[in-house]
């Protein structure tokens, strides 16, 4: 049930002419017993209606109630005419007589009305029109209108009868509009416009309200039409209504109480009940046809036409209903929609303003979105056009991004990858080839976009006319201590090996040597097992490999590794059997061992050149150089010096005062000072170049090594370098490569396998040695890192926190302190004040210049992480023979040593009936009265046990000691 607020009730009362302020209305409602607090309080509809009726009954003027009528009754206006003199009413039985009523004076009207000749005929014409009426009549079931009107008998005029008081006012019927003061029908000429009164009511004189239904009007020569025929004899006649105050009232005529109707505001129809008929009143049905409109009579302002209002649902939903009061539909417009130009021209300014207000009130508001129903036609799947089924990606793309681009579920893509044998997650990066495979499976085409390195580093076609002969690049490889560097010293006529730590080479050395056969570039690689990556890089950039094998040692593991690296690079191998001057040298045994690796000497019918040489006596060195020159001629080594330079990084390091220094080998073009180059994720401009002798050079032709200064960082050994147009282009290429590397690292996800978990469980609870590695050159740092990682065992692992080149800095110390690790420096030293900072942070710094010494020391540190094994070592036994009680010491067990030795402060166990009753330590050990350190077998002594006095004869005391045994890494 809906509610109504107090201020809305006040507005409704105001429409009925009752002016009440909000405070007065609240006090009135409280007086009537309603629980309200302010003008915003709410009342139920039935409560509001009851309060409205009560207040209206108290404040409205008393008037005779109009005859109740059904819904749809319309009270029309009546024309004002001259009232004829009213006849005096005849006295009625059992009722008081009425006073004689004087005739009304002629009243001004809107139109001149002709006098009526035959009042009886006019009365018949002035009958009310047929209007819908409820099924049940308030008069006690009077039949519906449509019966023929019957003339009523004329009542005799009353003689000086007192006026009858007006009946109490009844509530107005909401379906009836208040009419203007009407005139008797007998005073209107035929055809004059007359507004009919309520059904069954004859109008009275001008200025008099119509009587209640069934009231008999008076007038000269006018008989009321009474349903049911003439009145029966003896039936009392209805009294005449008193004339109201106002124009046309006769002097001395009694008037009904109440205010002047002209001062009232338009309200619902009100009437004064004079009397009710004793017989049912039938409604008169006028003849069908067009009605004649009559001018309205003077009097109170009449209400406008009756409008039929429509109940519409609210635009905001919430199951509310509102009354549509819009007038736009009468003008052919829809509320809330734009007005056409023609309609706007036809309206006045005031109407346009009203229309604008109405349109503003009808702004359409979107309601709740309806859920799609399952009914209807089947959804049609549309296919994309071919030009829209193209996906553009860069080097890599994640599975989720690819699924969004294709409009395919990520689970479907992962399923396809699993079917192809690739495990991937939704956020994992996949390369362009894998993305192209998935795109093809779902009908899409993949195109690469973004940065193209070829735009900055284009491939240049080889111009045969500009090619010149370049020197060969020869890499010397072999096992450690087989004389590789000594052989190069003999060729260069230098003594490099004597200056190397431990007499071994630990990074690549590049040298350009002038020989009688021409210039040759030699690369000296380390032979230690830790420098595998260096040997592989040397094999990739070389034209010829000289494999050095000691005649007294034979083929060793690194010899085999060098053979495999050279074959993998597709490089020609030339074997130099060194140290033939030493006693016990057997070159034939070496040649026999090499045949197992498909290296057969020419002397034995093979294709491999094998020469016996001696670095000490320089035996066989000229023949070696001749064979190198012969092989270079066979290979036809040529290059174009006019191209932009390109090549490979042989070694890189970070020197104090010089910055990043890279040793590069120029393979194509000519490298000049000032060139902008890029290598890996680093770039820069060549600031200076130096050869192997430390001399600065301005340009380097192809086939020669050189040290380059001016890079933004330390490059990775083995990376290619290229010269580009300017430094800006070099920076863009380097940044693109760095971004690509970052995405690759993020996409690579390493998951722990069961083997990793078992290995961690077997490693003593996951003991790990954290290490920070710093070296002089990038290759050495890489070699040390790999060597330390290989030193890890099942019990203790090795984790490299960081690795780099250059001096040990404060940042390295803080990194090691955060990871509770150590710092390993190889061929480098810490900066000033770094040792004191490391001591404060509790970080150990280990410095080495020989790699195998570094590995041995790291293994010791790893073993120190393992907890020692506690082992029990038996000492001896003693049997308790007697007990002695000594003050402050308690019971002393007089015992005889039966086995081994009993030492003071040794751990003991007391056994009684072969069961341990106590374990502790010896507190005192005496021989007679002297304290002794130990007692041997066969002697008696007194033994005092700490915290135990319940010793009994026959107990056995076992003495033992605990010793710690350091665990082994194996």
Curated annotation (Swiss-Prot):
Q: Which segments show compositional bias classed as Pro residues?
A: 150-160, 168-182
An example GO CC term for this entry is:
cytosol
Q: Where is this region: G3?
A: 524-527
Q: Where is the composition biased (Low complexity)?
A: 87-96, 121-149, 183-253
Taxonomy of origin reads: Bacteria, Pseudomonadati, Myxococcota, Myxococcia, Myxococcales
Q: Which residue intervals make up region (G2)?
A: 503-507
Main location group: cytoplasm
User: What is the protein name stated in its UniProt record?
Assistant: Translation initiation factor IF-2
The annotated region (G5) lies at 614-616
The similarity comment for this entry is: Belongs to the TRAFAC class translation factor GTPase superfamily. Classic translation factor GTPase family. IF-2 subfamily.
- Domain named tr-type G is located at 469-638
Map out region (G1) in residue numbers. 478-485
């Amino acid at each position: 049930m809906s509610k109504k607020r107090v201020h809305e009730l006040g507005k409704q009362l105001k429409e009925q002419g009752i002016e009440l302020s909000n405070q007065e209305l609240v006090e009135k409602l409280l007086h009537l017993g309603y629980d309200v607090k302010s003008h915003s309080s709410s009342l139920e509809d039935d409560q509001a209606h009851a309060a409205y009726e009560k207040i209206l009954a108290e404040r409205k003027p008393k008037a005779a109630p109009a005859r109740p009528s059904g819904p749809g009754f319309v009270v029309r206006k009546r024309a004002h005419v001259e009232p004829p003199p009213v006849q005096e009413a005849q006295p009625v039985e059992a009722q008081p007589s009425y006073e004689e009523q004087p005739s009304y004076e002629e009243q001004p009207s809107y139109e001149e009305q002709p006098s009526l000749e035959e009042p009886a005929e006019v009365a018949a014409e002035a009958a009310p029109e047929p209007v819908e009426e409820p099924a049940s009549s308030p008069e006690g079931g009077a039949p519906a209108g449509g019966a023929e009107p019957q003339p009523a008998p004329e009542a005799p005029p009353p003689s000086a009868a007192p006026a009858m008081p007006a009946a109490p006012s009844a509530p107005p019927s909401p379906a009836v509009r208040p009419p203007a003061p009407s005139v008797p029908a007998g005073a209107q000429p035929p055809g004059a416009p007359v507004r009919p009164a309520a059904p069954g009511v004859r109008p009275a004189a001008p200025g008099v309200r119509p009587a209640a239904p069934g009231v008999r009007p008076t007038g000269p020569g006018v008989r009321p039409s009474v349903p049911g025929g003439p009145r029966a004899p003896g039936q009392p006649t209805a009294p005449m209504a008193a004339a109201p105050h106002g124009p046309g009232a006769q002097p001395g005529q009694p008037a009904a109480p109440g205010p002047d109707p002209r001062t009232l505001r338009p309200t619902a129809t009100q009437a004064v009940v004079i009397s009710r008929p004793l017989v049912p009143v039938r409604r008169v049905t006028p003849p069908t046809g067009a009605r004649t409109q009559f001018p309205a009579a003077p009097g109170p302002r009449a209400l406008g036409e009756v409008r039929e209002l429509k109940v519409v649902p609210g635009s905001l939903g919430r199951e509310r209903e509102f009354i549509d009061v819009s007038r736009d539909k009468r003008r052919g417009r829809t509320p809330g929609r734009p007005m056409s130009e023609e309609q706007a021209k036809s309206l006045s300014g005031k109407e346009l303003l009203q229309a604008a207000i109405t349109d503003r009130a009808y702004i359409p508001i979107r309601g709740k979105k309806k859920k799609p129903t399952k009914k209807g036609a089947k959804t049609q799947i549309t296919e994309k056009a071919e030009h829209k089924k193209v996906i553009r990606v860069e080097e890599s793309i994640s599975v989720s991004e690819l699924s969004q681009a294709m409009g395919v579920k990520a689970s479907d893509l992962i399923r396809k990858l699993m079917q192809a044998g690739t495990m991937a997650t939704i956020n994992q990066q996949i390369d362009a080839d894998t993305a192209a495979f998935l795109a093809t499976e779902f009908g899409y085409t993949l195109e690469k976009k973004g940065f193209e390195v070829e735009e900055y580093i284009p491939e240049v076609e080889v111009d045969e006319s500009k090619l010149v002969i370049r020197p060969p690049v020869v890499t010397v490889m072999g096992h450690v201590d087989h004389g590789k560097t000594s052989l190069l010293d003999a060729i260069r006529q230098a003594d490099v090996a004597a200056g190397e730590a431990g007499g071994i080479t630990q990074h690549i050395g590049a040298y350009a040597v002038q020989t009688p056969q021409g210039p040759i570039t030699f690369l000296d690689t380390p032979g230690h097992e830790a420098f595998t990556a260096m040997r592989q890089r040397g094999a990739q950039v070389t034209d010829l490999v000289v494999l050095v094998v000691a005649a007294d040692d034979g083929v060793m593991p690194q010899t085999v590794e060098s053979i495999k690296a050279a074959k993998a690079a597709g490089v020609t191998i030339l074997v130099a059997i060194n140290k033939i001057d030493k006693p016990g040298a057997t070159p034939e045994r070496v040649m026999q061992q090499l045949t197992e690796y498909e290296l057969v000497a020419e002397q034995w019918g093979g294709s491999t050149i094998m020469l016996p040489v001696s670095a000490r006596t320089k035996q066989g060195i000229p023949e070696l150089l001749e064979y190198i020159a012969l092989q270079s001629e066979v290979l036809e080594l040529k290059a174009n010096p006019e191209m932009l330079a390109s090549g490979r990084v042989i070694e890189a390091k970070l020197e104090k005062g010089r910055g990043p220094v890279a040793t590069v080998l120029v393979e194509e073009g000519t490298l000049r000072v000032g060139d902008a180059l890029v290598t890996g994720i680093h770039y820069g401009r060549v600031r200076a170049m130096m050869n192997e002798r430390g001399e600065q050079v301005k340009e380097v032709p192809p086939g020669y090594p050189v040290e380059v200064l001016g890079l933004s960082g330390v490059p990775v050994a083995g990376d290619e370098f290229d010269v580009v147009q300017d430094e800006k282009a070099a920076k863009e290429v380097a940044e693109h490569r760095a971004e690509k590397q970052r995405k690759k690292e993020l996409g690579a996800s390493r998951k722990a396998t069961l083997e990793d978990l078992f290995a961690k469980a077997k490693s003593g609870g996951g003991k790990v040695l954290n290490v920070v590695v710093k070296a002089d050159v990038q290759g050495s740092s890489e070699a040390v890192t790999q060597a330390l990682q290989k030193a890890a065992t099942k019990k203790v692992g090795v984790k490299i926190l960081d690795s780099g080149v250059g001096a040990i800095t404060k940042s390295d110390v803080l990194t090691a302190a955060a990871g509770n690790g150590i710092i390993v420096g190889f061929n480098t030293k810490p900066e000033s004040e770094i040792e004191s900072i490391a001591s404060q942070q509790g970080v150990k710094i280990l410095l080495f210049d020989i790699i195998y010494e570094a590995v041995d020391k790291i293994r010791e540190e790893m073993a120190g992480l393992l907890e020692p094994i506690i082992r029990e070592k038996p000492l001896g036994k003693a049997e308790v023979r007697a007990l002695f009680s000594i003050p402050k010491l308690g019971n002393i067990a007089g015992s005889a040593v039966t086995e081994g030795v009993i030492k003071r402060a040794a751990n003991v166990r007391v056994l009684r009936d072969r069961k341990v009753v106590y374990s502790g330590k010896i507190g005192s050990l005496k021989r007679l009265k002297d304290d002794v350190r130990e007692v041997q077998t066969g002697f008696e002594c007194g033994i005092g046990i700490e915290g135990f006095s319940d010793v009994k004869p026959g107990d056995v005391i076992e003495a033992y000691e605990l010793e710690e045994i350091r665990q082994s890494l194996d």
